[in-house]
Design a protein with these regions (language model features):
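Histidine-acidic metal/acid-base catalytic patches
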Residues: 2-50, 54-69, 135-137, 193-215, ...
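Active-site acidic/histidine proton-transfer and metal-coordination neighborhood
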Residues: 8-22, 35-38, 110, 114-212, ...
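N-terminal substrate-binding region of glycoside hydrolase catalytic domains
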Residues: 64-82, 102-107
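Glycine-rich, proline-tolerant flexible connector loops at the mouths of alpha/beta enzymes
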Residues: 75-92, 143-150
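Short amphipathic alpha-helices and their capping/turn segments at secondary-structure boundaries
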Residues: 82-95, 123-135, 163-171, 226-233, ...
Length: 269
């Protein structure tokens, strides 16, 4: 599926149907050094989160995805290490690969409590190792949600700490053949890291090729004035995209004129 075909279908509300809020847009799944040089064309690879496609079983959902040209699968990270064999078997012989892994860790990296940070590090590394076994492009993480307290203050020192810890995680992810993917959220969900540009600058400062970032049209609607500017600012660190309708966070195209993604896709192209 190419960019023009996807945009035409979603903008008239006739995109690939789904039973859950999100479908996803993913960059090429094998590891690379970024989206390529400006002016180069990049393939559009659609990916669904695990429960997006209709079906009672995983096999039925994967059948649906294949029938509609969806070539990526984004499972959750919780208990992922115990599911590696199951997922490999389910994907065997299919034109579907694991794209990103959606979080699933315990604790959080910016907790003021050492034991909570240690729990995050332990469980995140378990997920990263499983992601590598599955050939995933990376594990999505958020530094802290609004409900997670006590949390480190929003200071330059906290940013320095985050950069240092992500460098270690990123280097470990590279050893496992995958990456860590930072996801900016809107201010109603997270006080820290709300724009793609900020995520990209953190990726840069880690100095690790195992730390990348992503954009999400839903969060960008609240936090950025330009989709083009937001995604272009991600540069070579941008690895994955989430897309949803911009008014109700459902299927792209369901909210009429609000669901205009053209500027964002221009940046991705």
């Amino acid at each position: 599926m190419d960019r023009r075909d996807f945009l035409q279908k979603t903008l008239v509300g006739a995109a690939v149907a789904a039973a859950a809020p999100w479908n996803l847009l993913a960059r090429p799944y094998p590891q690379g050094e970024g989206l390529g040089k400006p002016g180069e064309s990049n393939p559009l690879r659609l990916s669904f989160q695990e429960n997006t496609a209709p079906g009672e079983t995983l096999a039925e959902r994967l059948d649906y995805m294949e029938a509609h040209g969806v070539t990526g699968f984004e499972p959750g990270g919780k208990n992922l290490s115990a599911r590696v064999g199951e997922l490999k078997q389910a994907l065997r012989g299919r034109n579907i690969s694991v794209s990103a892994i959606c979080a699933g860790f315990s604790g959080f990296i910016l907790s003021e409590q050492p034991e909570v940070r240690a729990e995050f590090d332990r469980t995140m590394r378990e997920i990263i190792a499983a992601a590598g076994e599955l050939g995933s492009t990376g594990v999505i993480m958020v530094p802290a949600f609004n409900h997670q307290v006590p949390v480190m203050p929003h200071t330059p020192q906290t940013r320095d700490y985050l950069v240092e810890q992500l460098r270690k995680l990123g280097d470990y992810a590279r050893e496992q053949g995958t990456t860590v993917i930072l996801e900016p959220l809107n201010r109603k969900e997270a006080h820290y890291l709300r724009q793609v540009a900020d995520a990209a600058s953190i990726c840069r400062d880690t100095g690790s090729r195992g730390v990348c970032c992503m954009g999400d049209f839903w969060h960008m609607t609240a936090e950025d004035t330009s989709d083009y500017g937001a995604l272009w600012s991600g540069g070579r660190y941008l690895r994955h995209i989430h897309i949803a309708s911009r008014g109700t966070r459902q299927m792209p195209g369901e909210n009429g004129d609000k669901d205009n993604y053209v500027d964002g896709f221009r940046a991705l192209k």
